[in-house]
């Protein structure tokens, strides 16, 4: 398609210039109205006016200043309408003109020449006034929007009249558009807060445009709509196969009878053919219905992405530094009111964090990063208060000034050097599109969806449960605080532990293996002072139960994760209660928050945790944590804030602030009761900080997670045949043997289908049982059976005992 720029200039000769009217009493293009072929199409806006020869002469005689290409003074330009060149009437006519396109924060808004023809919007860079010249072969059908665009054309015509030879050569060399947008598959949105702006979304990119005046924008929007009307949307009923479709077999019958085939055989052939056609028709209906659903989903995604990306453009890149200090204080105080605004259970429901009007001003929100980056929090004195209380701001309990004394453990076990990376893959991983697999499971429970091994990480859900205990030292610290009589510091450390379990999910884009019914996992970490055991206790619903024994405490729980796919995201809702019991009798309980995985179809895949977590237990204090849902415009996502409340008085005695993938801090007291100007962050104390991996690893596993599937020397002979470390497909995936892993996964899925029949026949888990409240509790006896290697009553659920020998010989860890 020939552009309207980089073409030979328009001649000002009356005989060759199509801009010149044929008579003094006729406006341009007026004579073409009676023979318009597009009279049935919607007409253009009445803002478009016809330009006469006198008007053009006045325009060409004006002293026109150079147009500001940076768009700084574009709003001051005058535009009174749209102008037609040649015989231009109806919806089929081309449209052209100047609009300002958003480039980036460095360049801002830049002028571009736009041309709309046959439903395709093309745009070109403007390198000077001589470049905006229309092709004489096409200018008769061009409708130019805006006087600024006309000035450019007239200026180019006057300035280039003495270079007609060179222009003729240029006319034969069409300029390639800098970009093209097909309006048939695009959505147009006009800004509500700025009457000169609009956005065009194609599904893969968004053009943010600004016109010189609101009249120009109205003309462009109407032109876009007219162009879209040339390609009407097909109704869903128009593409569905007809219910009354009749298949005639008369010709087949005549042909068979002519060949001497008997009547009985002919009827059988007819019946077979009609049956096959009926099956094909039914399949076509199903495919057509899915096609309609997917189209509607994509259109909805288009609209949502337009709003979100327009919001990003509206966001100011830099903030005035003089307002930073005041905002930091006000944002901090807003934490208390924001967290305590609602105590209802409705907080656990999904919040539409992305539901933002794209063109409205940004609403101020709490910014954890402004606080975490404060200079006071980076000082050495702040770090030294990590394990201390602060009596200066909470002097009701004098023991806050004492340091926590944790008795040192004397190792009475051989130290095990654990691996710090996974084996190098033996095969090259094949790229597989996730959308192509899960598109047929929209709205379904994903626990029953079978995915290729390429979407898994070499860990099972049983091992993921133990990964939540990576920072178990926080429980040990809570135990010691309780021994010193400080229940407040105990619940603060428990809150930090509850948040720390989410740290390892950052950057993890693969799902763990779904355990087989009866599959188990053990973890004996004497260096941490704990041992852990978990078992899959139910197949439908899929429930995993776990139990952990520490020094002075026990931790247990069961988890039933309900997952659903909603087109653009996967939502995981955990069902179950986690319980922590200390030897002194105090019990604390909480439940996990909702997890969602976004951008399944388009964009960068990421996960987010959101909702409200309530930690109940103890006699004096309770805690409430709010995981803020991430939105597209969040500069600092993954925020967590909350407070500890004194159950006796109802007062807030401490607040917690941080991010679930970085660190958690606390401040004693209620900062909202302090005088104006008080900076609570000078008293902030670090509770927990994530151990960052020094190098990037496969599957983004942390060093702790890498050790979970390792078989250390001497372990293979003690493991039961149900342990996750012996699962063959998971082991093949860890070694990078993808073909073998896929084959084993299919084989085990066949075995897993028998699990439901076993459960229906009254199958019961070996190491857990339900209590009166319906929760699974550990029966005991596993570690005793492990010492005796008493696995006679344990079934080899993987049906591959020969694997144990190969694993025993390949173990690479050593005792020191």
From Swiss-Prot:
The record's keywords, sorted A to Z, are:
Coiled coil, Lipid transport, Lipid-binding, Transport
The answer to whether UniProt assigns keyword tRNA processing to this entry is: no
The free-text tissue note of the record is: Expressed in roots, leaves, stems and flowers.
| Coiled coil location | 290-321, 735-764
Every copy of the PH domain together lies at: 92-229
Tell me a GO biological process for this protein.
Answer: lipid transport
Pfam families noted in UniProt? Oxysterol_BP, PH_11
Q: Which cysteines does the record link by disulfide bonds?
A: none
Q: Where is the composition biased (Acidic residues)?
A: 344-362
Keyword presence, Membrane: no
In terms of InterPro entries, this protein maps to: OSBP_sf, Oxysterol-bd, PH-like_dom_sf, PH_domain
Question: Per its UniProt entry, which superkingdom is the organism in?
Answer: Eukaryota
Task: Cite the residue spans of the region called Disordered.
Answer: 340-362
Which GO MF terms are attached to this record?
Answer: lipid binding
Q: Which family does it belong to?
A: Belongs to the OSBP family.
What does this gene product do?
A: May be involved in the transport of sterols.
Q: What is this protein called?
A: Oxysterol-binding protein-related protein 1D
């Amino acid at each position: 398609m020939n552009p309207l720029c980089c073409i030979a200039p328009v001649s000002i000769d009356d005989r060759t210039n199509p801009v010149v009217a044929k008579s003094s009493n006729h406006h341009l293009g007026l004579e073409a109205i009676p023979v318009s072929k597009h009279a049935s199409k919607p007409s253009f806006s009445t803002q478009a006016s016809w330009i006469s020869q006198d008007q053009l002469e006045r325009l060409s005689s004006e002293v026109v200043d150079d147009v500001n290409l940076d768009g700084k003074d574009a709003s001051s330009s005058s535009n009174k309408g749209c102008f037609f060149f040649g015989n231009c009437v109806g919806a089929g006519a081309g449209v052209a003109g100047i609009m300002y396109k958003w480039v980036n924060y460095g360049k801002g808004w830049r002028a571009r020449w736009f041309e709309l023809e046959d439903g395709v919007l093309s745009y070109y860079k403007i390198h000077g006034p001589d470049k905006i010249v229309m092709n004489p072969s096409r200018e008769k059908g061009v409708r130019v929007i805006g006087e600024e665009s006309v000035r450019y054309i007239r200026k180019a015509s006057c300035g280039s009249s003495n270079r007609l030879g060179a222009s003729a050569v240029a006319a034969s060399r069409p300029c390639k558009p800098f970009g093209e947008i097909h309006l048939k598959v695009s959505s147009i949105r006009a800004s509500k807060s700025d009457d000169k702006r609009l956005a065009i979304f194609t599904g893969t990119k968004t053009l943010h445009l600004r016109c010189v005046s609101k009249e120009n924008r109205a003309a462009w929007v109407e032109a876009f709509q007219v162009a879209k009307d040339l390609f009407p949307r097909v109704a869903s009923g128009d593409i569905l196969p007809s219910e009354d479709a009749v298949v005639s077999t008369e010709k087949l019958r005549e042909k068979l009878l002519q060949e001497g085939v008997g009547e009985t055989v002919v009827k059988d052939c007819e019946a077979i053919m009609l049956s096959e056609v009926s099956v094909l028709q039914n399949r076509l209906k199903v495919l057509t219905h899915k096609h309609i659903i997917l189209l509607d989903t994509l259109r909805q995604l288009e609209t949502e992405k337009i709003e979100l990306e327009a919001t990003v453009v509206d966001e100011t890149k830099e903030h005035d530094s003089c307002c930073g200090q005041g905002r930091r204080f006000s944002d901090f105080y807003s934490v208390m009111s924001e967290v305590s605004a609602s105590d209802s259970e409705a907080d656990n429901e999904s919040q539409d964090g992305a539901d933002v009007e794209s063109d409205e001003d940004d609403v101020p929100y709490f910014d954890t990063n402004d606080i975490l980056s404060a200079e006071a929090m980076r000082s050495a004195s702040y770090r030294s208060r990590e394990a201390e209380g602060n009596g200066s701001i909470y002097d009701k309990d004098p023991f806050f000034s004492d340091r926590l004394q944790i008795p040192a453990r004397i190792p009475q076990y051989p130290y095990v050097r654990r691996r710090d990376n996974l084996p190098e893959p033996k095969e090259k991983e094949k790229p597989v599109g996730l959308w192509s697999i899960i598109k047929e499971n929209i709205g379904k429970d994903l626990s029953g969806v079978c995915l290729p091994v390429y979407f898994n990480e070499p860990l099972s859900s049983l091992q993921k449960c133990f990964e939540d205990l990576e920072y178990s030292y926080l429980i040990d610290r809570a135990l010691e605080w309780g021994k010193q009589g400080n229940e407040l510091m105990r619940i603060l450390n428990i809150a930090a532990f509850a948040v720390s379990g989410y740290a390892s999910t950052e950057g993890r884009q693969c799902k763990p293996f779904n355990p087989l019914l009866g599959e188990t996992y053990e973890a004996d970490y004497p260096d941490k002072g704990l041992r852990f055991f978990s078992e899959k206790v139910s197949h439908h619903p899929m429930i995993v139960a776990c139990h952990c024994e520490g020094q002075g405490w026990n931790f247990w729980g069961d988890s039933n994760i309900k997952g659903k796919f909603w087109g653009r995201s996967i939502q995981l809702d955990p069902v179950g209660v986690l319980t922590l019991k200390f030897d002194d009798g105090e019990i604390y309980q909480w439940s996990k928050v909702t997890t969602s995985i976004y951008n399944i179809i388009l964009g960068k895949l990421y996960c987010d945790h959101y909702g409200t977590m309530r930690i109940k237990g103890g006699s004096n204090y309770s805690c409430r944590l709010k995981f803020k849902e991430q939105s597209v415009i969040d500069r600092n996502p993954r925020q967590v804030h909350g407070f500890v409340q004194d159950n006796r008085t109802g007062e807030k005695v401490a607040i917690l602030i941080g991010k679930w993938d970085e660190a958690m801090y606390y401040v004693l007291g209620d900062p909202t009761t302090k005088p104006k100007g008080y900076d609570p962050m000078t008293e902030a104390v670090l509770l927990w900080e994530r151990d960052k991996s020094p190098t990037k690893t496969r599957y983004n596993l942390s060093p702790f997670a890498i050790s979970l599937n390792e078989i250390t020397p001497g372990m293979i002979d003690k493991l039961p045949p149900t342990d996750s470390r012996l699962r063959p497909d998971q082991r093949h995936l860890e070694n990078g043997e993808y073909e073998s892993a896929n084959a084993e996964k299919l084989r085990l899925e066949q075995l897993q289908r028998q699990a439901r029949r076993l459960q229906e026949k009254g199958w019961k888990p070996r190491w857990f049982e339900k209590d009166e409240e319906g929760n699974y509790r550990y029966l005991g006896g596993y570690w005793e059976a492990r010492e005796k290697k008493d696995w006679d009553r344990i079934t080899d659920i993987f049906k591959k005992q020969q694997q144990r020998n190969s694993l025993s010989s390949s173990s690479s860890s050593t005792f020191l």
